[in-house]
C-alpha cells in the first residue's frame, strides 16, 4: 500500500484484511489528497475524511442467509438430538467490520431459527462474538445448542484450520460455518 501511495495515484482501491494495519497509510492518503475506495471491509477507526466511499455486501444479511441454509440442512438433527449439540463458526478475525457483521448475522439468525423451534442457545468462544450476540438465552452448560465461535491469532488458512479442527473434534459438533474465504478454506 505504501508503494502505491508513493506513486501518487489518482485514487486507491483497498480491501484490507487487517484494518488496523492501514490507518497510517490512510492518514498519508488524506495528506496527499488521494481518495480511497474500500471494498467490503469497513474500517471502523479510519481517519476522518480518508474514505471517499465504500463498496460492500450487506454482510449481516449474507451471514443470515448462510444460517438459514445451514439450518435447513441440520434442523432434523437438532430436533432429534438427545443432548447438547454444537454449531461451529470460524471467523478470520474479530476486527474487520465485514467479518464482524457476517459472523454476527449468522449467529443472530441461527439463534432466531433455533429458538423458533423451541431450543435454548448459548454462544461461546471468542469474546467479541459472544458479547455481540443478540438474544442467546442460556448458559453454555445448560443450552440445547451452543454456537462455538473461534478466531485464530492471525489471519491464515492454517490457523483457521486449527480452530476448525478444535471445534470439529467435539463429538457433538453437527455443523460448522466459515465466514469468508480464508475461514472456509481452513474449515475444509
Language-model-detected regions and their locations in the chain:
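A residue-level marker of the well-folded mature domains of exported/periplasmic proteins
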Residues: 1-188
Amino acid at each position: 500500500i505504501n508503494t502505491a501511495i508513493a506513486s501518487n495515484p489518482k485514487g486507491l482501491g483497498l480491501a484490507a484484511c487487517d484494518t488496523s494495519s492501514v490507518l497510517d497509510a490512510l492518514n498519508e492518503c488524506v495528506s496527499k489528497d488521494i481518495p480511497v475506495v474500500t471494498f467490503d471491509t469497513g474500517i471502523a477507526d479510519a481517519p476522518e475524511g480518508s474514505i471517499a466511499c465504500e463498496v460492500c455486501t450487506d454482510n449481516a444479511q449474507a451471514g443470515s442467509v448462510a444460517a438459514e441454509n445451514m439450518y435447513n440442512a441440520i434442523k432434523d438433527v437438532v430436533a432429534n438430538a438427545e443432548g447438547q449439540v454444537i454449531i461451529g463458526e470460524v471467523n478470520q478475525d474479530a476486527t474487520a467490520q465485514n467479518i464482524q457483521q457476517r459472523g454476527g448475522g449468522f449467529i443472530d439468525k441461527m439463534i432466531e431459527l433455533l429458538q423458533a423451534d423451541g431450543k435454548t442457545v448459548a454462544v461461546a468462544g471468542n469474546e467479541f462474538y459472544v458479547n455481540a450476540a443478540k438474544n442467546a438465552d442460556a448458559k453454555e452448560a445448560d443450552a440445547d445448542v451452543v454456537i462455538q465461535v473461534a478466531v485464530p491469532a492471525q489471519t491464515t488458512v492454517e490457523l483457521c484450520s486449527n480452530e476448525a479442527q478444535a471445534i470439529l473434534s467435539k463429538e457433538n459438533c453437527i455443523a460448522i460455518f466459515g465466514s469468508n474465504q480464508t475461514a472456509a478454506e481452513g474449515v475444509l
